[in-house]
Amino acid sequence: MESLLENPVRAVLYLKELTAIVQNQQSLIHTQRQRIDELERRLDELSAENRSLWEHQQLLQAQPPPGLVPPPPSAPLPAPAVTAPAAAAAQEPLQDHGQLIPASPEPPLQHHGQLLAQPQPAPSSRVQTPQSPHQHPVAPGAIADKEKERPSSCCAAAGALLQHASPAALGKGVLSRRPENETVLHQFCCPAADTEQKPACSDLASQSDGSCAQAGGGMEDSVVAAVAAGRPSAHAPKAQAPELQQEEERPGAVGSPRAGPLRAASPGRQQPALATALCSHTPAASEYELSLDLKNKQIEMLEHKYGGHLVSRRAACTIQTAFRQYQLSKNFEKIRNSLLESRLPRRISLRKVRAPTAESLVAEKALLEGCGLLGLPLGRSPSLPPTFAGSLTELEDSFTEQVQSLAKSIDDALSTWSLKTMCSLQESGAYQLHQALHPSAGQPGLETEAAAREPESGPGSGDEAGGLPQGHSGTLMMAFRDVTVQIANQNISVSSSTALSVANCLGAQTAQATAEPAAAQAEQEDTADQEVSEVPASEQMDPPSEDSEAAESRAQSAQEPAVAQAVVEEAVATEAEEEEEGAKQAGKGAEAEGGDNSEQLSSSSASTKSAKSSSEASAAASKEALQAVILSLPRYHCENPASCRSPTLSTDTLRKRLYRIGLNLFNINPDKGIQFLISRGFIPDTPIGVAHFLLQRKGLSRQMIGEFLGNSKKQFNRDVLDCVVDEMDFSNMELDEALRKFQAHIRVQGEAQKVERLIEAFSQRYCMCNPEVVQQFHNPDTIFILAFAIILLNTDMYSPNIKPDRKMMLEDFIRNLRGVDDGADIPRELVVGIYERIQQKELKSNEDHVTYVTKVEKSIVGMKTVLSMPHRRLVCCSRLFEVTDVNKLQKQAAHQREVFLFNDLLVILKLCPKKKSSFTYTFCKAVGLLGMRFHLFENEYYSHGITLATPLSGSEKKQVLHFCALGSDEMQKFVEDLKESIAEVTELEQIRIEWELEKQQGTKTLSVRSAGAQGDPQSKQGSPTAKREAMAGEKAAESSGEVSIHNRLQTSQHSPKLGVERGAPAPSPPTSPPPLPPDPQPSPLREQPPPLPLPPPTPPGTLVQCQQIVKVIVLDKPCLARMEPLLSQALSCYASSSSDSCGSTPLRGPGSPVKVIHQPPLPPPPPPYNHPHQFCPPGSMLLRRRYSSGSRSLV
């Protein structure tokens, strides 16, 4: 028993140590805040004095005749209170910041200008007064805009300190600190719903970043219009906006605001200048987004207007490439010059690597001592250093090192504690979590053995012991979002965040052996040769199979256009294998998510010892029951909650289609694609889960992976990038070889700001993997500069738009890196080796699905449509014969056509004579699949014929094409692929229209109501129309004292007797109800939502999915004793609630009156534990709630 529970106990010990570390860091930050308050007070005093002197000087200058006596300075005008902070910002002595920031070579006037440019917390009644001659004028509108656009953050002040910011950033943090957000998220193990509130302009910018390169293979569409017109492109401000952001935030050409791995988890990285630039150059947020076919038609019209397809596209590619290279060179020059002048904030933090087995030894020692939950000693003393600028970085490194080591230890401890392990605990009874509340005094640890509690769960007493009424004797399936680990002196138990994780929902017969629990356990086992299952993917994907890699390597060897047909066949085979693999990985369910990611604490409950052999029908029933519960959970990264209301339970074909739709959405707009895949349950809603998905799954454009990871506007994207680089090992590798490995997975190109963000994350990881290499340099930031220079060298050396005589030579490369290592030069042999290796082999990304499309496009002559797009995927290639008249016989050889079917396009080609042309195919026509209809025909002339009808753009006419095949097998395969592709593109367009309607109606501001009704998943199958039938949710702006809106229990009754007693389901709610406020006392007359469709009956066993650890709360024995009555009351409350209601709507049980039961209040928020690379200090209210009186109970 102790061996099975060793890993959870060890994880609890690590979490306990982490809590102590975070508390010490909080005390350090609290002390720093006190110093900031003192400096702020002194600043106010100096401001008042300075203002008084300034007013006095003004009065002396405007003095009337000399005979008059000027007014004494002791009686100033009322104006000193008007602009005191502004004058203080202009006249602040630099020595006041001597302990906070290092000395800067900039003149005092520049400091004054920086401080003055920051927004002031001035009330609305302030009036602008004349400024002194040396002050820079600031418009009042700019101040108001900056004050309005800056979002509140829990790390605004601490982030400015931890980054060694310039006086501008310091003044921004000191003068205008805002109330912090009290909702602290566990980014590593259990993130809750995203609480960042961002301006509409920044939302639009983040959405448009991923879509600006969707047409033309990474080239902005509107650049075509700028070729001949000579006007700036509509996308040019997007590339220039980051430069404006840097110049606004750091007038002295300071680099990125990141300081090592501890970035401030603040959504305010978008500065007012960036928001203003984007708002002035981008359309309104309510503007309708065109479909792909309309966008392609728009590009076609632009090309026709500006010189034709070839001329305009060649010019656009030249302009785009030159502009991006110019931006990269400009950024590199700025960073290099800043580093030479010692004005660059420290980006890379050099940290010592802790021994990997230290934590495990400490944990084992603590376990041998009887689980004495005393705080483990810290690596370093977190006491306040004498000088902030000299010692805070060391504390940052120590804290980050401890957090990362603990995170890895928690990973190792939780990875082996899976559903399979917990199911093995039970030999003849259920795993009852609530029995840990009644342990025996002589046994330490967890007492969950079912044998000791079998008398209590006997016939007639199993339901009464849990507080369940007799009417609910069926199996009660529950799914948890939040789980709390309660720690007493010698006893540990697991419960939900509201009351209790109930697993004692057993039937009357515990000795009855059935096959469903065994099937459920077998479904959760993560084996390599698992069959395709029916559970949609909450997967953590395995690496691609060897067959897929072999096919891909074979396709890579086919480089000549003459073998384009072989390339197509291999591409189609690879796509088929990838689809099957995606379906297999999708069927692994929540076990793979919990076991592989180590992000979710999984436990299971079974009623009896399962039989070894089980039928497939019972296995499918159990899988569907588990699937209905798991997919009904709310999701973390649902920016558009309306799209996450209806989890999809479908057949294998529809599940594959939805997965491909998610891949297409990612390749069009990465943020929307990730949102869709998370909402459908294909990937976990955690940064590490998304990172594994991006690294291991096929079908993703590497260009769009770089676009997603390089987006620094969203905190989730930055966390995913940190997790991605943490998955890569650069140990004992040269810098250019490590960068080659990084570039193989992520295409480092695009906007200069995104490239800089990717290189910065790579450099940080390289320094962590090679500390001995970094020690050879004077400054760890030299790694970042050198990596940036390598990217520039690779772009310059292999760009077709740069003439050979203008390419970068070795001496130019050495000259660019002169003096970047704190004034010293990088060793010449190192630079020469890097140059020679880049010259021999280009840095390029691995092949993806776009590679096959590009090879086909290069083998076609006269191609008028751009095929190489990130979202376009080759489905199949068939040899058909075009029929001009179905009623006449014709020679088939004269009309042979090669039909290439893509996921959104049908391209018709004919073979070229090999003697006349080096190309393989000649372009005939291309038709879109959206709106296409087809039917098969057979007559005396053509036995296997098909008619395709596609609508012509701009008219009601249709283009009709007739084809025939030689055999029925080839035609049948082509028809199946065509039918599925048409359904895929049609569903994708419906999803786009649905999102646009929701955006136009303003439903983005609403969140999903917990008690919203869920339609029939088998009938709706996740289509956009199913989302309209879901209940509208309550507003997302909840009280900051609540932890989240997701910590509710979702119950699903699976009992045939209960289903008969319930009768017909209630009528469904209206399609678009108004948003309902939370109702503390629901009316019994309110219309009940329809229950979930009941699957086939299951045994009285219970399967519990404890998805994530959110809180660690220390409870003593008295607190635990006071909680037991409340837990029993909460158990009866959940048992009487409806199967699909997560709110407070009561359910009338069979023969029982309606009762209004109040739920217990939510627990206090968790300790602030974020991703290992970040730290988010708690607010003042959080400190009072959690730490004012020591340990708190759940109630």
UniProtKB/Swiss-Prot annotation:
The modification Phosphoserine is found at residue 256. Residues 523-532 have a biased composition (Acidic residues). Expressed specifically in the adult brain, but not in the fetal brain at 14 dpc. It is found in: Cytoplasm; Postsynaptic density. InterPro entries: IQSEC_PH (IPR033742), PH-like_dom_sf (IPR011993), Sec7_C_sf (IPR023394), Sec7_dom (IPR000904), Sec7_dom_sf (IPR035999). Keywords: Coiled coil, Cytoplasm, Phosphoprotein, Synapse. It comes from the Eukaryota. Residues 80-93, 553-574, 598-615 have a biased composition (Low complexity). The keyword Phosphoprotein applies. The keyword Phosphoprotein applies. GO terms for biological process: regulation of ARF protein signal transduction. Pfam families: IQ_SEC7_PH, Sec7. Belongs to the BRAG family. This is IQ motif and SEC7 domain-containing protein 3. It comes from Mus musculus. The gene is Iqsec3.
